[in-house]
Amino acid sequence: MINVGLLFGSKSVEHEISIITAHQVLSFVDKNKYNIIPIYITKDGKWLTGKILEDLENFKNLERLEKKSKQISSISAKDGKLILHSNIKKITIDVCLLTFHGSNGEDGSIQGMLEFLNVPYTGCGMYSSMYTMDKVITKLILKEKNIPVVDFLYTNKKNYTNDFLNHCKEVLEYPMIVKPARLGSSIGVKKVNDKCELEEAIETAFSFDDKVIVEKWIDSRELNCAVMGYKNIVVSEIEEIKKQKDFFDYNEKYVQKGKKFSNHIIPAPIDENLKNTIKSIARDTFNALECHGNIRIDFLLSKDNKIYVNEVNSIPGALSYYLWQMSGFTFSQVIDNMISIAFEAFKDKKSKIYSIDTNLFDLKVEK
């Protein structure tokens, strides 16, 4: 049986969403194939494990949860396996299944640690996770590859001045959408119609991230699809999100009906040509950002039927199982595929050369 470390939580404003995704995995994973070891990272960075983490109800009382959990005191690795030390107990992990959302988990930070420790993990690699987490880097790469994105500008807290507000008006025109550059779940996102609203929205976005992207707002439909694979890529069915406002916000996604997927129309009511175009752009996006694993790509469809890549999620909420279900995959099969891809990518990584058989300090230097 394969020991799977299910990592979730972490220091992120999307912390609770990560917990939900992890427990969806716990509900549907094939326990005849995998021994699931939950590893919860608290908001202040503690690493916890234990059976108590397997019941979502226990997360209502975090103080009790921490007391009843086993704190991981140290982490090491040997022979491609992650080793966790908790009191006197040692836990060995064969592969890590990542269900983080947002900063300090989905952004390449945990992936970088696992790369350094030489341990297989699900989802995109370190660099790809970093690219896709940053909306600015994502759009710059896609633009370079001639993949359609809406017009945008960006700034950071260090260099931000009033001139940026004027530049936005000249280049983008109102209305615009303001977003923290490295955040998901529509947190901190605002539509603005004038300079005063723009300035206020940028300040709000800066409270979540020190980098902000401002995009031209277009009246559009929101379409999504998932892409999964490594060397062979498969694209899921396409969905349409029926939004109640100008964009599908955090409240709709997780607090109101959005959490029950009542706003999701699968398959999306679009013609076959448009469907094929979106799937083709999805494949190109997956490759341009050097992704592997299971991602979700969000699109905008304008009134004149132009398609734009809006955002890329390297660890989508609920692992986009609802999209894969409509494409003939069970949630359990999605998890199987993600773990298989993790091992395949790890095998390729092991073939790389990381050192040269030369001792520079032992070389004789002619005088």
UniProtKB/Swiss-Prot annotation:
Keywords: ATP-binding, Cell shape, Cell wall biogenesis/degradation, Cytoplasm, Ligase, Magnesium, Manganese, Metal-binding, Nucleotide-binding, Peptidoglycan synthesis. GO terms for biological process: cell wall organization; peptidoglycan biosynthetic process; regulation of cell shape. Binds 2 magnesium or manganese ions per subunit. GO terms for molecular function: ATP binding; D-alanine-D-alanine ligase activity; metal ion binding. Disulfide bonds: none annotated. One of its GO terms (cellular component) is cytosol. The keyword Cell wall biogenesis/degradation applies. InterPro entries: ATP-grasp (IPR011761), ATP_grasp_subdomain_1 (IPR013815), D-Ala_lig_Van_CS (IPR000291), D_ala_D_ala (IPR005905), Dala_Dala_lig_C (IPR011095), Dala_Dala_lig_N (IPR011127), PreATP-grasp_dom_sf (IPR016185). Pathway: Cell wall biogenesis; peptidoglycan biosynthesis. Mg(2+) 2 binds at E311, N313. It is found in: Cytoplasm. ATP binds at residues 169-224. Belongs to the D-alanine--D-alanine ligase family. Cell wall formation. This is D-alanine--D-alanine ligase. It comes from Thermosipho africanus (strain TCF52B). The gene is ddl.
